[in-house]
């Protein structure tokens, strides 16, 4: 789950998978194990495996990252497995694809990595400064010193921040995911 923010960010730009052959070979053993432990489906029955999609991807995530690396997991494995479960081939198509590949490579297309969306609120605070100025010209009547207080800034958030640091919030999430990957 630590890697989910990065997966969501990069999944939209990845190529669509058309068959089990589009899943990187390094992910196949991890996905095979996850399918076997989390479903009672045959590895080539994508319609069945996609029904238990969440459990399979949760089980396979850390193994895929360990075996393939974060970059391959995000840019290749995740999009390939998500697209296969969006439009899984009919059982006969899955079997014909499986016959063309090694038997250990057919289960990879049935799961994806964990996707969790998180958000954080930025709070901005300001302090008001008070300045006291003594009169410069002496007068005969007693006057009190003039006091001015600048108006306090109002914290802002939301879509009105169209540029600056607000435009980099996706990059921050990606950096957070990269640090989480290094922590393991």
Swiss-Prot record:
GO cellular component, one term: fungal-type cell wall
Signal peptide from the UniProt entry: 1-17
Disulfide-bond pairs as recorded: 26-68, 30-63, 41-48, 50-85
Any Gene Ontology biological process: effector-mediated suppression of host innate immune response
Propeptide: 164-184
Residues annotated to bind heme: 45
Null mutant phenotype: Decreases virulence in maize stalks. No sensitivity to Congo Red (cell wall disrupting agent) or sodium dodecyl sulfate (SDS) (membrane disrupting agent), and in vitro cell population growth appears normal.
Membrane topology summary: Lipid-anchor; GPI-anchor
Record region (Disordered): 83-106, 136-163
Chain residues carrying a lipid of type GPI-anchor amidated asparagine: 163
Domain notes: The CFEM domain mediates interactions with host proteins.
Assigned protein family: Belongs to the RBT5 family.
Protein's recorded name: Effector CFEM1
Organism the protein comes from: Gibberella zeae (strain ATCC MYA-4620 / CBS 123657 / FGSC 9075 / NRRL 31084 / PH-1) (Wheat head blight fungus)
The gene coding this protein: CFEM1
């Amino acid at each position: 789950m630590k890697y989910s923010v990065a997966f969501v960010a990069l999944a939209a730009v990845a190529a669509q998978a058309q068959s089990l052959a589009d899943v990187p070979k390094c992910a196949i053993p991890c996905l095979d194990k996850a399918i076997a432990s989390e479903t009672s489906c045959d590895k080539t029955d994508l319609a069945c495996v996609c029904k238990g999609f969440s459990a399979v991807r949760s089980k396979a995530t850390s193994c895929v990252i360990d075996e393939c690396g974060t970059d391959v997991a995000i840019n290749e494995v995740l999009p390939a497995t998500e697209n296969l479960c969006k439009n899984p081939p009919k059982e006969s198509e899955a079997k014909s694809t499986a016959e063309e590949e090694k038997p250990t490579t057919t289960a990879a297309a049935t799961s994806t990595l964990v996707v969790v969306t998180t958000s954080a609120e930025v709070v901005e605070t300001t302090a008001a400064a008070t300045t006291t100025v003594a009169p410069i010209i002496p007068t005969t009547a007693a006057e009190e010193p003039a006091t001015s207080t600048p108006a306090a800034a109002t914290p802002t958030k939301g879509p009105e921040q169209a540029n600056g640091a607000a435009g980099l919030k996706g990059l921050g999430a990606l950096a957070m995911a990269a640090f989480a990957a290094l922590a393991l």
